UniProtKB/Swiss-Prot annotation:
The species this protein was found in: Rattus norvegicus
Molecular-function annotations in GO: structural constituent of eye lens
Assembly and oligomerization: Monomer.
Record lineage: Eukaryota, Metazoa, Chordata, Craniata, Vertebrata
Expressing tissues: Detected in the auditory hindbrain where it is highly expressed in the medial nucleus of the trapezoid body, but also present in other nuclei of the superior olivary complex.
PANTHER family associated with the record: BETA/GAMMA CRYSTALLIN, GAMMA-CRYSTALLIN N
Acetylation as UniProt keyword: no
Pfam families attached to this UniProt entry: Crystall (PF00030)
The name this protein goes by in its record: Gamma-crystallin N
Keywords: Eye lens protein, Repeat
Length: 183
């Protein structure tokens, strides 16, 4: 069974100031809890979290692991808008992901069990990944740019036949890493 608990505290002000919202599980709309959608700092006390810039777990994703994020640019945010969050489902510490060139698991395939800052350095011929399979226990973050930069997408155990299955705008993936979960 996936471990999906933890604690994250969201603050309206920079450096952990202003009104705050403590979350211990899925929160699909911050406004429903009386908190505006403006988040300028975050403290992750336990677990790994994926936050979204819109309610209902939609929009741009941000992965947040254990630690302090005193300003929104620390989590790759371009502004202070955030609408929902949820803990990342973790099953253990055994990581494996297969990436595929074509949709529906066709074409070139590469397996990863460790972080990879640049897929092309491992023999991946293209800048696109059209399907993935996540095995094992852990979750992964896919990045559109090398060295864990650009738009990010969190994927947990399962089959993703097309980039739209992980809510991506395009098939562009150039780096990937494991999600580390601290309790």
């Amino acid at each position: 069974m996936a471990q999906r608990s933890g604690k994250i505290t969201l603050y309206e002000g920079k450096h952990f100031t202003g009104r705050k919202l403590e979350v211990f599980g899925d929160c699909d709309n911050f406004q429903d809890r009386g908190f505006m959608n403006r988040v300028n700092s975050i403290r992750v006390e336990s677990g790994a979290w994926v936050c979204f810039d819109h309610p209902d777990f939609r929009g741009q994703q941000f992965i947040l692991e254990h630690g302090d994020y005193p300003e929104f640019f620390r989590w790759n945010g371009h502004n202070d808008h955030m609408g929902s969050c949820r803990p990342v489902g973790m099953h253990g510490e055994h990581f494996r992901i297969d990436i595929f060139e074509g949709c529906n698991f066709t074409g070139q395939c590469l397996e990863f069990v460790e972080d990879c800052p640049f897929l092309q350095s491992r023999g991946w011929a293209k800048s696109c990944v059209n399907a993935i399979k996540v095995y094992g226990d852990g979750a992964w973050v896919l990045y559109e740019e090398p060295n864990y930069r650009g738009r990010m997408y969190v994927v947990e155990r399962g089959d993703f036949r097309s980039f739209s299955d992980w809510e991506a705008h395009s098939a562009r993936v150039q780096s990937l890493r494991r999600v580390l979960n601290f309790f």
